[in-house]
């Protein structure tokens, strides 16, 4: 887009507008100015009388009173920026002094503060573009760089620079087209990287930098460790960064995004040019002087919104402006001949467009009349002219939001953020009462967001807010510290229906859910997500299927917002190819069924932790929108041995979805309700959308994925999982996490086998080992992961920097990328399950280094060294590796069968049209585990469907009757016939014979057999009704199938016993298990018929 190329244009074409600066010197200058202003305000009137000494420019200021060590700036102790210092703490400690001896020292003056956009500054926060990133990440080197950066900012004497980092946490649905193009470019870059490493064995060039998997979360955890204030955006990241910048009075913005240059930011610094000196005394970068930029372009600052709208952006893309851009160049331009290429859309170069558009904008007589400007811009357009003009006006208004106003108001935002799933204005704070049982709280309106308390202490054993409930005063009360906190207002409610900014950020692509799907719940802790069984029944009965919640049903292959008619698409412009007349939204969204209701307490906690950067960013969006975006990692699309990361860890994400929506308890409640009402009821599947890009999968369309439940036990609801304080709740959190990662075995929680800080790594490796599509990790590769985790070199980044690797291993690079993608999924599962693993044990720098892994993999693979040599000759480390390997491989069948002919993964399931394959098979595109059957009705014995292969009845070995199946088997293999045997060799057990049945005994008494069958079935059904879900009256026909491996003992067996006290729904019946048929009853019927 033209906007994205604006920053590069500034750096190359506007040399006078880019000046080098030292941020640390600027911070000290700001601090001295604030001290002088503070002393000038405190001087008595006598000091200002004639003849009194005054502070003039160039003279030394009066010495300030001595400050306590705790008041030196925003950072203390040299350990990084302090997140907990507040003047109230100082007065509390020094308030015991007798009055008159020592006056209370003044509060520390706020130093310079810079807001960092982590979305565009990740390469610099990682430590630069060093070449070792291709190995999977050198996390201890990154940790050392961030530590040096924080110590350099903590300048002694109160003249430090405070850094506040904002991470992107929104889905960015309005920028999906831009995200899709970026994913395609990253996929191409990944292929270049893999090819370069495979051919030359050297690191790729710096220009091919691709962020290592899980980089954003690793940087976030590292900043939390150094007590840097961390926040996450919720919807539109750019506008929220600007709003946060304005509301909290920052002195500068450090980023690398062209849109910030057009947002009228007072002090905009380049994160791309950020450099920290080796001694930590200088932190240099480039500052963009936008006043000089406007002067060189001949523009006024007030015309920047129109200029940005006409460059091409996510609202009005380049394709809609191509004809306008070519018309500005004119036929005499040297590049004019490029636009006449046959059937191909060609765009002018970005720098040429910027010059031409700036000249056009400067010539506009009345910039306020957007209708006239829009008609003039699109006067050559022959299709969708009105739509283009409307998009142009929305783009102008989008960029005018932060340009016209000097500061953003506090309260309902005019930015049009969609902060809730209903899209309605929030309730006023005075109308928020206590949550009453059974009363719908989110029926039509969402409560206003709570204000953020000061950052919470991060002790060595903290669990990041998962030890208290929402209603406790110490967690969410507005105390004195909160009132003076500069970030206290960063929880203002954003309203999408305000008149100041009419919803230009929203689109009908993902409409907010209607009142039918609103959150209604009670505060009873035993209810799943706070919803009672009666409410679940009503929700299921009234739930529309594949339907637009707003009433508009989506077509089969058309998104809900694609309002382009056939006649419009058929039109084309004479000179520009037909792409200009088509819809520019080149991604297809799909409307999913309404999500299950989520308790208000859970949503408030999720949003709070999301805003504070204390939670995986997509958990809130899964709960509210049912969507997630999966980043691209380094994958060789020509290598068929290793699956894509998005498919490899999809099963774990599906289990996480089931945990987040409390699917297990919902199923159990539905089954209880079905038993009570004596009606069969199916639990509706929870469908979510995953946006990803890998081989054979375009990022333009999402994949529909269903949530799964654990087969072994019933996971508690999310409210109890997050806010429960009992010891059993902590055990259930850990078991839920282990079950999501398929690592629920006793040895995983045994510190003698798996050290506590290596639990998350071992869970990821065990998950990768269990991939049924083929062997991902060989023996020496698994040992390499474990050996580098226990190596002492892991904590020596200086030695690793000097480590030389002759030739990089291409497979090792892909394995490292898969592993770090698994760490990313494990962080997602850990946060969703209530963070049973403390955040200190989740950080990858305590168990992985990409360069160290490469060096040891070469030794183990090429040189074939022993395990002791792989562990640097230390036998004790080798024994640790062996114990961890045994724990990882416990109960795992390493002899994987060859993958069968698997069904192709459909790119999407169109609304209102049933799929050719069931949703449960979507995750099996590359041979993943077949998920357990969803929505099984286990409540009624005897109500079994007629087998499709038919069956026959044998009495004393004689066939007395046969019946046809419900449908043909369609030649999908030899399915055995169902055989019900009474007496004889079968001894009353249902059995199945291979093929179509034996050739003998074809003749029989048809009439007699039908009577016997009808009476037997009638008696059996009456017996089943009298013993609903009983044990003696159940008829389960044994089918011939491969027996499932015996489940290994769970890590927390006590919980599995406790969850089965009330009913027998926790452990489903597996194939191969036999339930005895009441042979006495069937024999009695048969004997009576023979008589």
From Swiss-Prot:
Top-level taxon: Eukaryota
Q: Which stretches does the entry tag as region Disordered?
A: 35-105, 503-575, 966-1010, 1037-1077
Which ranges are annotated Polar residues under compositional bias?
532-544
Ranges annotated as biased composition (Basic residues):
82-95
Biased composition range(s): Low complexity: 35-53, 966-976
Record keywords:
Methylation
The UniProt entry, under InterPro entries, shows: Coact_PPARg, PIN-like_dom_sf
The keyword tRNA-binding belongs to this UniProt entry's keyword annotation: no
For this chain, the family text in UniProt reads:
Belongs to the constitutive coactivator of PPAR-gamma family.
Protein name, entry field? Constitutive coactivator of PPAR-gamma-like protein 2
What species is given as this protein's source? Mus musculus
């Amino acid at each position: 887009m033209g906007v994205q190329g604006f920053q590069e244009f500034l750096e190359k074409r506007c040399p006078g507008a880019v000046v080098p600066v030292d941020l640390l010197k600027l911070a000290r200058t700001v601090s001295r100015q604030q001290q002088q202003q503070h002393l000038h305000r405190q001087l008595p009137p006598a000091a200002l009388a004639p003849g009194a000494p005054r502070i003039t420019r160039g003279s030394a200021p009066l010495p300030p009173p001595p400050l306590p060590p705790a008041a030196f700036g925003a950072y203390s102790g040299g350990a990084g920026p302090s997140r907990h210092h507040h003047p109230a703490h100082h007065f509390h400690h020094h308030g015991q002094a007798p009055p008159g001896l020592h006056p209370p020292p003044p509060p520390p003056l706020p130093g310079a503060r810079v807001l960092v956009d982590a979305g565009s500054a990740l390469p610099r926060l990682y430590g630069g573009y060093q070449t070792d990133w291709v190995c999977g990440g050198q996390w201890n080197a990154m940790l050392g760089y961030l530590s040096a950066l924080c110590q350099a900012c903590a300048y002694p004497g109160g003249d430090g620079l405070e850094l506040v980092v904002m991470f992107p946490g929104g889905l960015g649905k309005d920028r999906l087209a831009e995200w899709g193009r970026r994913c395609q470019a990253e996929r191409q870059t990944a292929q270049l990287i893999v090819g370069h490493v495979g051919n030359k064995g050297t690191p790729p060039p710096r220009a091919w930098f691709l962020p290592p998997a899980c980089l954003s979360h690793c940087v976030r955890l590292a900043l939390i460790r150094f007590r840097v204030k961390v926040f996450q955006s919720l919807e539109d990241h750019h506008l929220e960064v600007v709003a946060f910048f304005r509301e909290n009075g920052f002195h500068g913005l450090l980023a690398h995004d062209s849109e910030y240059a057009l947002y009228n930011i007072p002090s905009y610094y380049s994160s791309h040019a950020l450099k920290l000196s080796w001694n930590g005394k200088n932190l240099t970068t480039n500052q963009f002087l936008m006043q000089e930029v406007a002067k060189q372009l001949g523009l006024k600052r007030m015309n920047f919104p129109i200029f940005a709208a006409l460059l091409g952006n996510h609202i009005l893309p380049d394709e809609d402006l191509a004809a306008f851009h070519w018309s500005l160049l004119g036929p005499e331009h040297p590049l004019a001949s490029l636009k006449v290429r046959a059937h191909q859309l060609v765009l002018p170069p970005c720098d040429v467009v910027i010059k031409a558009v700036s000249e056009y904008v400067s010539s506009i007589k009345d910039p306020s009349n957007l209708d006239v400007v829009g008609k003039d811009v699109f006067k050559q357009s022959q299709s969708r002219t009105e739509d283009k003009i409307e998009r142009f006006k929305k783009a102008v208004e989008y960029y005018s939001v932060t340009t016209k106003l000097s500061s953003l108001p506090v309260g309902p935002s005019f930015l049009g953020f969609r902060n809730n799933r209903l899209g309605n204005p929030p309730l006023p704070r005075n109308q928020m009462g206590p949550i009453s049982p059974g009363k719908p709280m989110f029926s039509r309106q969402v409560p206003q967001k709570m204000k953020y308390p000061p950052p919470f202490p991060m002790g060595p054993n903290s669990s990041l807010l998962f030890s208290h409930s929402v209603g406790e005063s110490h967690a969410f009360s507005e105390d004195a510290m909160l009132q003076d906190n500069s970030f206290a207002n960063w929880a203002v409610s954003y309203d999408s229906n305000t008149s100041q900014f009419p919803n230009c950020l929203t689109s009908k692509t993902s409409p907010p859910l209607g009142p039918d799907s609103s959150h209604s719940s009670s505060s009873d802790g035993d209810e799943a997500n706070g919803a009672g069984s009666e409410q679940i029944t009503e929700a299921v009965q009234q739930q529309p299927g594949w339907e637009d919640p707003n009433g508009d049903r989506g077509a089969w292959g058309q998104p809900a917002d694609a309002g382009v008619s056939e006649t419009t698409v058929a039109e084309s412009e004479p000179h520009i190819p037909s792409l200009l007349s088509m819809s520019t939204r080149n991604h297809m969204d799909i409307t999913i069924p309404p999500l299950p209701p989520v308790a208000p307490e859970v949503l408030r906690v999720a949003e709070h932790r999301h805003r504070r950067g204390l939670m995986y960013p997509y958990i809130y969006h899964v709960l509210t929108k049912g969507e997630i975006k999966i980043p691209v990692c380094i994958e060789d699309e020509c290598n068929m041995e290793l699956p894509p990361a998005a498919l490899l860890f999809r099963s774990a994400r599906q289990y996480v979805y089931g945990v987040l929506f409390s699917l297990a308890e919902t199923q159990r409640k539905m089954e209880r309700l079905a038993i009570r009402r004596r009606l069969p009821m199916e639990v509706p599947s929870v469908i979510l959308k995953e946006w990803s890009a890998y081989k054979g999968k375009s990022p333009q369309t999402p994949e529909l994925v269903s949530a799964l439940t654990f087969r072994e036990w019933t996971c508690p609801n999310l409210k109890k999982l997050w806010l429960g304080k009992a010891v059993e709740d902590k055990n259930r959190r850990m078991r839920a996490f282990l079950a999501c990662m398929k690592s629920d075995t006793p040895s995983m929680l045994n510190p003698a086998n798996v050290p506590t800080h290596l639990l998350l790594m071992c869970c990821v490796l065990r998950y990768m080992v269990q991939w049924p599509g083929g062997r991902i990790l060989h023996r020496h590769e698994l040992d390499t992961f474990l050996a580098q985790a226990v190596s002492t070199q892991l904590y020596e980044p200086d030695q690793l920097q000097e480590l030389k690797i002759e030739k990089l291993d291409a497979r090792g690079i892909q394995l490292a990328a898969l592993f770090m993608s698994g760490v990313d999924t494990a962080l997602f599962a850990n946060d969703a399950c209530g963070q049973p693993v403390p955040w200190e044990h989740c950080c990858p720098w305590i168990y992985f280094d990409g360069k160290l892994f490469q060096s040891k993999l070469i030794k183990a693979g090429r040189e074939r060294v022993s395990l002791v040599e792989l562990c640097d000759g230390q036998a004790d480390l080798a024994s640790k590796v062996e114990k961890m390997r045994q724990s990882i491989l416990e109960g795992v069948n390493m002899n994987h069968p060859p993958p069968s002919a698997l069904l192709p993964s459909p790119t999407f399931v169109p609304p209102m049209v049933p799929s050719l394959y069931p949703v449960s098979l979507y995750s099996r595109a590359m041979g993943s585990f077949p998920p357990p059957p969803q929505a099984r009705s286990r409540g009624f014995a005897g109500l079994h469907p007629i087998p499709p292969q038919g069956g026959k009845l044998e009495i004393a070995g004689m066939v007395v009757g046969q019946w046809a199946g419900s449908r043909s088997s369609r030649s999908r293999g030899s399915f055995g016939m169902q055989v019900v045997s009474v007496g004889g060799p079968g001894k009353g057990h249902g059995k199945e014979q291979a093929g179509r049945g034996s050739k003998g005994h074809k003749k029989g008494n048809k009439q007699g057999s039908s009577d016997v069958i009808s009476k037997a079935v009638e008696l059996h059904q009456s017996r089943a009704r009298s013993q609903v879900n009983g044990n003696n009256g159940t008829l389960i026909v044994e089918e011939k199938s491969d027996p499932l491996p015996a489940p290994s003992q769970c890590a927390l067996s006590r919980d599995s016993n406790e969850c089965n006290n009330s009913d027998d729904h926790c452990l489903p019946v597996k194939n191969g298990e036999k339930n005895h048929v009441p042979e006495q009853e069937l024999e009695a019927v048969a004997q009576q018929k023979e008589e």
